[in-house]
Amino acid sequence: VSAIAALNSTLPRTQRFSSSDLVLSIDSLARSYPLLQVMNALFSNASVALNSVAGEKVDFALATMGVSPTVIIASSRTMSDYHDRIMQPHTGPISSLGRWVQSRTLEAGNMPSKNIFSQLARIGPTAELSLDKLRLICISHRIDGDASARLSSEQLTDLRVFTGARVVYALTGPGIAGAIAQTNVFDYRCLTGQSHFGSPLSSTEVTLTGMSESHVSDGIPEGQVR
């Protein structure tokens, strides 16, 4: 229960699930994060869509076919594969121009609005998708999962630009209800390398071990998550 409440409270009031949402999970409900996000949707009186195409690694276009959700719950592996196989190769000169303009808006701290540049950006990378109502993508990465599936800040920026949706990126782990940490939905920073996972959820207590006290200070918290 506390994990469901924590997932709900990490979203600002204007971005939380509501009765007007259609939530689609394309990640397996055998995993804690997608399951509790679906329960969060039900608690918020949102509609939930389920299909037979769900798992850690699925075809994003196939899994979203025939439905127009406002919220999608997916794994980092699914989104990483779709970005590398479809989005990046199909980003031509026109899409690149639209992406450049839209990414400048994100760097300024604002979510790009739907305009001519957003349409230009999506000409190639998301032409096969019908996600006009999509407003939020909830992505999770398992702490014991394949490191190659971790998303970079650049990939998260592409997902925001090409889908027109905000993105939250969560770190999950075995035995953890919901998530260990999750990014802020309004954090649009594009940093070098792999993206961070934000701050810990209110339902999680994180203990760092494996570092001697002489090497750890309040300014540099380091260690292994226990």
Language model features with spans:
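Conserved AMP-binding/adenylation subdomain of ANL enzymes
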Residues: 2-22, 29-105, 166
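Eukaryote-biased feature marking scaffold/signaling PDZ-domain proteins and nuclear chromatin regulators
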Residues: 18, 27, 36, 201, ...
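Short, well-ordered beta-strand segments
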Residues: 22-24, 225
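Short hydrophobic segments within beta-strands
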Residues: 25-26, 140
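Short low-complexity stretches enriched in small and charged residues
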Residues: 26-29, 160-161
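Residues that cap or flank secondary-structure elements
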Residues: 28-30, 147-148
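Conserved AMP-binding/adenylate-forming
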Residues: 109-226
